[in-house]
């Protein structure tokens, strides 16, 4: 038997120390990585529950193991809440990640060698949308579309031309670094014109979509995938949604289990259910609205200070800043901001002359700072501090001064209030 007094600090002091240090970092640094967020104490409590002990291969009421009556309740709640939240006819809450959700769709609807059409990683797509290092680029004939050079927005004419030329079996819409509204219906029309499936990866904007702050693709696409963290603010995991089609639903279920996964993570599925419930609250709607406002304020500040924001602004939670004109690298800017306790990620930008481990830009996102409580004034100040650092990159006096401001602002807005 286990003794509850044997806490982590007693059992593994090294891991405990690392966790405490990370907790301190999260409280004292400003997090601007667009794919990150802080999840709620209720979600974290659920992830640490005894549900982690239960194996439950299969689906609710169709398990291969006994003793699943209570985890069936949990998974069915997660399914029902996901369908309600996003207006979907079908939901699979078992994917361990967004990439596995995408892999399951590929396995369900395609065979190796089929042609796919997805957004180029260099222009804001995701690895699983056909990038060469990914399974999606290795196992399938991947054709890539990109951005219009003048507008910095998706080149729908190029998508249509490529679709007609290569006749893909599936077109993938969605992104990991794109700041504008996507015309899901335009993608649907292009897919229909060549008889292709349309898959949408809405991982980055799922929270905005859940509250109507960004257009929903769920009723338009054949299949929609997402992560459950990022803007959605739940546990790390994946989700597959679809409109009613029994054939596709059966294929999707089989692709997850037994296709690419075995037992589902019931403690994570329960945490997903909790986060879906949280996402139905009025407070959450207010939060998502502020996420957009904060991103727009920050992007506009960079523009006013003379920096190139790709596409000229943002309609969601993120934006890209290109430093090609300044001759700066994304890596150098990332490092300098990090020294001031401002965390971003270097990111490739259109026509980037630098390799992926260097880049010429950064990606900035506001989900985390908005969770802390930052408002427009805070975000305007923050963007100005970032511009000050970029204007005099490497000036340690500037970095030190701004680091002090960052620590003070973080103290004003703690992530987790003490009891």
From Swiss-Prot:
Task: Please provide the record's keywords in A-Z order.
Answer: Amino-acid biosynthesis, Cytoplasm, One-carbon metabolism, Pyridoxal phosphate, Transferase
Q: Which pathway does the record list? A: One-carbon metabolism; tetrahydrofolate interconversion; Amino-acid biosynthesis; glycine biosynthesis; glycine from L-serine: step 1/1
Q: Identify the Gene3D superfamilies for this entry.
A: Aspartate Aminotransferase, domain 1, Type I PLP-dependent aspartate aminotransferase-like (Major domain)
A Pfam family name for this chain?
A: SHMT
Q: Which cofactor(s) are needed, names only?
A: pyridoxal 5'-phosphate
Q: Report the enzyme's class at the first EC level.
A: transferase
Cite the binding residues for (6S)-5,6,7,8-tetrahydrofolate.
121, 125-127
Q: Name one GO biological process term.
A: tetrahydrofolate interconversion
Q: From the UniProt record, which GO molecular function terms apply?
A: glycine hydroxymethyltransferase activity; pyridoxal phosphate binding
**Which NCBIfam families did the record assign?**
PRK00011.1
> What does the UniProt record say this protein does?
Catalyzes the reversible interconversion of serine and glycine with tetrahydrofolate (THF) serving as the one-carbon carrier. This reaction serves as the major source of one-carbon groups required for the biosynthesis of purines, thymidylate, methionine, and other important biomolecules. Also exhibits THF-independent aldolase activity toward beta-hydroxyamino acids, producing glycine and aldehydes, via a retro-aldol mechanism.
The entry assigns this protein to a family as follows: Belongs to the SHMT family.
Subunit structure, per the record? Homodimer.
Protein name from the UniProt record: Serine hydroxymethyltransferase
Lineage, please?
A: Bacteria, Pseudomonadati, Pseudomonadota, Gammaproteobacteria, Candidatus Pseudothioglobaceae
Q: What is the gene called?
A: glyA
């Amino acid at each position: 038997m286990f003794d509850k007094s044997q806490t982590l600090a007693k059992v593994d002091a090294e891991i405990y120390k690392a966790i405490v240090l990370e907790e301190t970092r999260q409280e004292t640094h400003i997090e601007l990585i667009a794919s990150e967020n802080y999840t709620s104490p209720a979600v974290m409590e659920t992830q640490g529950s005894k549900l982690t002990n239960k194996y439950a291969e299969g689906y609710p009421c169709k398990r291969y193991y006994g003793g699943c009556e209570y985890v069936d309740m949990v998974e069915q709640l997660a399914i029902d809440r996901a369908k309600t939240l996003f207006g979907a006819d079908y939901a699979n809450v078992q994917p361990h990640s967004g990439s596995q959700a995408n892999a399951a769709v590929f396995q369900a609807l395609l065979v190796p060698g089929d042609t796919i059409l997805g957004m180029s990683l260099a222009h804001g797509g995701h690895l699983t949308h056909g990038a060469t290092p990914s399974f999606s680029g290795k196992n399938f004939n991947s054709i890539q579309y990109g951005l219009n050079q003048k507008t910095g927005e998706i080149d729908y004419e190029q998508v249509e031309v490529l679709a007609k030329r290569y006749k893909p079996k599936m077109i993938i819409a969605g992104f990991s670094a794109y700041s504008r509204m996507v015309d899901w219906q335009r993608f649907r029309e292009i897919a229909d014109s060549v008889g292709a499936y349309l898959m949408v990866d809405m991982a980055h904007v799922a929270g905005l979509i859940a509250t109507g702050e960004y257009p929903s693709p769920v009723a338009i696409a054949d299949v929609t995938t997402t992560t459950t963290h990022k803007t959605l603010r739940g546990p790390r995991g994946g989700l597959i949604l679809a409109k009613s089609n029994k054939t596709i639903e059966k294929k999707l279920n089989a692709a997850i289990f037994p296709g690419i996964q075995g037992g589902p993570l019931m403690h994570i599925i329960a945490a997903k259910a909790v986060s879906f419930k949280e996402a139905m609250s009025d407070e959450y709607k207010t939060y998502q609205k502020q996420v957009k406002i904060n991103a727009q304020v920050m992007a506009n500040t960079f523009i006013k200070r003379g920096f190139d924001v790709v596409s000229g602004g943002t309609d969601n939670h993120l934006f890209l800043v290109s430093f090609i004109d300044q001759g700066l690298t994304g890596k150098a800017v990332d490092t300098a901001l990090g020294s001031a306790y401002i965390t971003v990620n270097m990111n490739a930008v259109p026509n980037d002359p630098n390799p992926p481990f260097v880049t010429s830009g950064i990606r900035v996102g506001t989900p985390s700072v908005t969770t802390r409580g930052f408002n427009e004034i805070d975000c305007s100040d923050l963007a100005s501090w970032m511009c000050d650092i970029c204007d005099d990159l490497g000036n340690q006096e500037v970095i030190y001064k701004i680091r002090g401001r960052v620590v003070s602002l973080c103290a004003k807005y703690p992530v987790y209030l003490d009891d």
